[in-house]
Amino acid sequence: MASPRTPVSPPELPEKNFQYRQVQYWDQRYKDAADSGPYEWFGDFASFRALLEPELCPEDRILVLGCGNSALSYELFLGGFPNVTSVDYSPVVVAAMQVRYAHVPSLRWETMDVRALDFPSGSFDVVLEKGTLDAMLAGEPDPWNVSSEGVHTVDQVLSEVSRLLVPGGRFISMTSAGPHFRIRHYAQSRYDWSLRHTTYSSGFHFHFYIMHKGRALSVSQLALGAQILSSPSPPASPCFLQDSDNEDFLSAIQL
């Protein structure tokens, strides 16, 4: 059974990439979300299901960060994972999702800033994010040199994720950002998790990071994490990806 949907029209794009970080842009973009179909960043559930499901248990308490109008939470419910809480800082889209999935009472929708989540510590077994960090870093002028503000923003989110996970919990991040950009953010010992990376494809080549709370990072990962405010060495042929022909902000946030 597929999620309820109508044909998806091209989204309203911002004039500048940094506007992806502004709630006003998302409120405007989602003003008709209750009547429009889901929009999926970095592939739909089917494209990464084989990677995600082995990390989940039916009884897991799952938190989805920056849910937007994605069908991910509903697809998790259909896949046998009913206990899903989804947050977004746009009250417009949260209200729309509450209406769209009112027939599924186990799905909860909350308006929250992912940098300061209003849940007790240890509330979740799994935290998922798909493109949320990418959007929060949109507008960074140089993907090889993340600003101190950008580093702080990511740290705020990851610190909250670590706080909310139970021992043995999993944080899963789906993104356009390759390891040479993203590992240095994730590989911080204070988060108390291990880190594994793989890829999946949905027309484009995307990255899938899995972190297990209570396990250790490798020595090489810790070394990369120590370089968080320095520039990584660029690969021989950097490849900047787009999520679609319309949304090209990813070319500026390979982080």
Swiss-Prot record:
Pfam families: Methyltransf_11. Its EC number is 2.1.1.-. GO terms for biological process: methylation. It comes from the Eukaryota. InterPro entries: Lys/N-term_MeTrsfase_sf, Methyltransf_11, SAM-dependent_MTases_sf. Transmembrane segments: none annotated. GO terms for molecular function: methyltransferase activity; protein-lysine N-methyltransferase activity. The modification Phosphotyrosine is found at Y39. Gene3D superfamilies: Vaccinia Virus protein VP39. Protein-lysine methyltransferase that efficiently catalyzes three successive methylations on 'Lys-36' in eukaryotic translation elongation factor 1 alpha (EEF1A1 or EEF1A2). Belongs to the methyltransferase superfamily. This is EEF1A lysine methyltransferase 4. It comes from Mus musculus (Mouse). The lineage of its organism: Eukaryota, Metazoa, Chordata, Craniata, Vertebrata.
